[in-house]
Structures are given as structure tokens and as C-alpha cells.
């Protein structure tokens, strides 16, 4: 990659700017530029596309996205120590990298989105990754402002994202992702690819928005999944008691003796629509 974009190796960048990944910020820097290119390629063609990135750190993934031809990258970085390293990348790619210093959880990405196609590609900080994904899945207007999400998570979170019914990993996150997206795990990334190495394997997940998801009120779906999976080993007649229990299930045509992990996304939407 250094040969491709003419920028110095990431290890040199980190040493020169005194960057150490901080646990409090959920940081693990991905330094293998072959891997950052693999992540960026998972998002598909990037020409004429604006890419949002969260937590770019020293900019390894940022460089890969730009080298693969993205029209522009808008990167949200909370750690001010990383800004000088990102400024060097911005100088190398004039007009194509905008860095916003701030908290991604408080950032209105839709308001920042320009006209034209938008993709989100990120090695998400572990401590905010799941909440960011949920935020991107919950807008009332659908299809959303983004064309795809290509995101790195701890593998256990990735398994929850893609899980369907009768899977041990199936839960509220799997229902939400299955309702509004077609999600797949693309590839795993071993701990030694990062600095410092996390204790767990990571995985890259690629999500595409469903054009016509089942009509369902988000707030009701949240209530139903929270109650059902909050007591996942109990029969639904018991776990859904606060929401109507057996009468709700009968109205939706669902056997009250079933358990949460056996319900499809469509059946959860049916329950939500009968609340």
C-alpha cells in the first residue's frame, strides 16, 4: 500500500505522532494495509461514492478507501491525537478527505450525507459499534441514506448480527438486522492484525438495506424483542405477559408455547403490529 499511495508505513506514522491505541476509546489500530484494502473492497465499487468512516485512527482504512477511488471520505474521529496523521492523508488527497472531530454517537450522519451514493465503511470502536449500527438501522425513512454498511466487529457481535431463528446467537440485534437488511459475515480478522492485539477474533460484516422490509413500528418491535429475549428460555405466553401474553399471541396466530428463538423476523413483526 505504501507503494500504491506514496504515504509512509503506518507503523512509522504511529511512532512519529506518538499514537498508542487507548482502551477507553475502544481503539485497536489495524496496521496491515493488505487487510485494510480487503475491508474496503468488501464494500464493492467506490468510484463516485462518498464514504463515511468512524474512528479512522492513524488512517490505515482511510488510505485504502481513497486508494480504491472513493470520491470523498468523511471521517469522524473523537481522538484529537489522530488528527495530524489524518491531515497528512488529506494533504495527499486534496479535497477528498474531510475529518470531523467529534463523537460518532452524537453525529447526524444523514444530515452530513451529500447528494449521490453513500457507503459506510469502518473498523468500529468496540465500545460503540453495536449502538452505531442500531442507529443506522432505525430511521423512519427507508431505504436509508446509505447504500451499504461494511463494518468490523468482535466476531461474537458479528454472529449476533447475521443470526436467524433457531440459532444460539439469535436475539434482538439479529431480528433488527434481519428485518431491515440482508447481512453476511465476509471474513474474520485475527487478533495479531491489530495493535494492540485484542483478546478476540474480529469479523467484517456487510449489510445491504432491504428495499421493502415488512411494515412494522420500530418502537413496538423493540418492546416485543426486549420482552421475548429478556426471558428467552421461557414460553412466549410467560415472557410476553407484560404486553398481553397469550391474548397477543393468539391474535397474531402464534402458538403461546413457543420460545423467542423459534420466531422468524416476520413473526416478530406480526406481534409488533398486533400490540
From Swiss-Prot:
Gene Ontology cellular component annotations, sorted alphabetically: cytosol
Pfam hit, one: RrnaAD
Principal location listed in the UniProt entry: cytoplasm
Subcellular localization(s) per the UniProt record: Cytoplasm
Keyword terms of this UniProt record: Cytoplasm, Methyltransferase, RNA-binding, rRNA processing, S-adenosyl-L-methionine, Transferase
Origin: domain of life: Bacteria
Its EC number(s): 2.1.1.182
Reactions catalysed, as given in the entry: adenosine(1518)/adenosine(1519) in 16S rRNA + 4 S-adenosyl-L-methionine = N(6)-dimethyladenosine(1518)/N(6)-dimethyladenosine(1519) in 16S rRNA + 4 S-adenosyl-L-homocysteine + 4 H(+)
InterPro entries: KsgA/Erm, rRNA_Ade_diMease-like_C, rRNA_Ade_Mease_Trfase_CS, rRNA_Ade_methylase_Trfase_N, rRNA_adenine_dimethylase, SAM-dependent_MTases_sf
Protein residues bound to S-adenosyl-L-methionine: 28, 30, 55, 77, 103, 123
MF term (GO), any: RNA binding
Function noted in UniProt: Specifically dimethylates two adjacent adenosines (A1518 and A1519) in the loop of a conserved hairpin near the 3'-end of 16S rRNA in the 30S particle. May play a critical role in biogenesis of 30S subunits.
Similarity field: Belongs to the class I-like SAM-binding methyltransferase superfamily. rRNA adenine N(6)-methyltransferase family. RsmA subfamily.
PANTHER family (alphabetical): DIMETHYLADENOSINE TRANSFERASE, DIMETHYLADENOSINE TRANSFERASE-RELATED
Name of the featured protein: Ribosomal RNA small subunit methyltransferase A
Amino acid at each position: 500500500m505504501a507503494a500504491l499511495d506514496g504515504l509512509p508505513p503506518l507503523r512509522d506514522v504511529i511512532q512519529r505522532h506518538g499514537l498508542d491505541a487507548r482502551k477507553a476509546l475502544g481503539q485497536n489500530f489495524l496496521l496491515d494495509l493488505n487487510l485494510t484494502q480487503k475491508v474496503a473492497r468488501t464494500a464493492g465499487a467506490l468510484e463516485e461514492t462518498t464514504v463515511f468512516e468512524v474512528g479512522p485512527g492513524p488512517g490505515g482504512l482511510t488510505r485504502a478507501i481513497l486508494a480504491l477511488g472513493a470520491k470523498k471520505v468523511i471521517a469522524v474521529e473523537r481522538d484529537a491525537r489522530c488528527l495530524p496523521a489524518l491531515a497528512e492523508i488529506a494533504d495527499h488527497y486534496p479535497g477528498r478527505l474531510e475529518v470531523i472531530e467529534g463523537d460518532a454517537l452524537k453525529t447526524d450522519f444523514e444530515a452530513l450525507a451529500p447528494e449521490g451514493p453513500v457507503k459506510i465503511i469502518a473498523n468500529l470502536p468496540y465500545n460503540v459499534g453495536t449502538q452505531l449500527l442500531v442507529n443506522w438501522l432505525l430511521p423512519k425513512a427507508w431505504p436509508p441514506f446509505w447504500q451499504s454498511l461494511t463494518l468490523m466487529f468482535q466476531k461474537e457481535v458479528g454472529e449476533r448480527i447475521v443470526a436467524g431463528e433457531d440459532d444460539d446467537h439469535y436475539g434482538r440485534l439479529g431480528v433488527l438486522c434481519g428485518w431491515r437488511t440482508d447481512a453476511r459475515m465476509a471474513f474474520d480478522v485475527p487478533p495479531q492484525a491489530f495493535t494492540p492485539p485484542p483478546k478476540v477474533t474480529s469479523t467484517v460484516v456487510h449489510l445491504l438495506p432491504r428495499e421493502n422490509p415488512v411494515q412494522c413500528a420500530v418502537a413496538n418491535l423493540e418492546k416485543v424483542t426486549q420482552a421475548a429475549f429478556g426471558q428467552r428460555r421461557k414460553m412466549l405466553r410467560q415472557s410476553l405477559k407484560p404486553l398481553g401474553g397469550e391474548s397477543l399471541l393468539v391474535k397474531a396466530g402464534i402458538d403461546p408455547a413457543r420460545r423467542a428463538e423459534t420466531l422468524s423476523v416476520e413473526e416478530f413483526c406480526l406481534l409488533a403490529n398486533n400490540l
